[in-house]
Amino acid sequence: MAEIKDPENTIVLETTKGKVVIQLFPDVAPGHVERIKGLAREGFYDGVVFHRVIDGFMAQTGDPTGTGTGGSDKPDLKAEFSETRHERGTCSMARTQNPNSANSQFFICFDRAPWLDRQYSVWGQVIEGMDNVDQLKRGEPVRDPDSITSMRVAADL
């Protein structure tokens, strides 16, 4: 396993394809990091599917309804756009056309996606298990989708 230097700011995501370890960026998107950690600690993401997986682009999850239209019961977040680029393994919040509409849905980039830079709130980076993300079933929507089996803050393990 990758060395976890800051367990309080590291997510361990268990999926139907294997483990994914994500380093959080509290200095870049503090509100989004707190939301991700809070929902993970509540078990919100456990059992949630990857409902939208586009080859060469990204894998999206975080909607408890599995449709891409749902979210948590918490208020939407204010955008925290930054200079952090959307690269392979970047974790960023999904949103509607309203920049301040991120809630619980997020995506992991398969490749560089410069059109997302400064338009979506980046909150982390995959540091281990990107090969498992690469194995997620593709589709919009995905038929018989892969899912998150558990999502935890490393400090709690």
Model feature map: region roles:
Residues 1-157:
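Cyclophilin-like peptidyl-prolyl cis-trans isomerases
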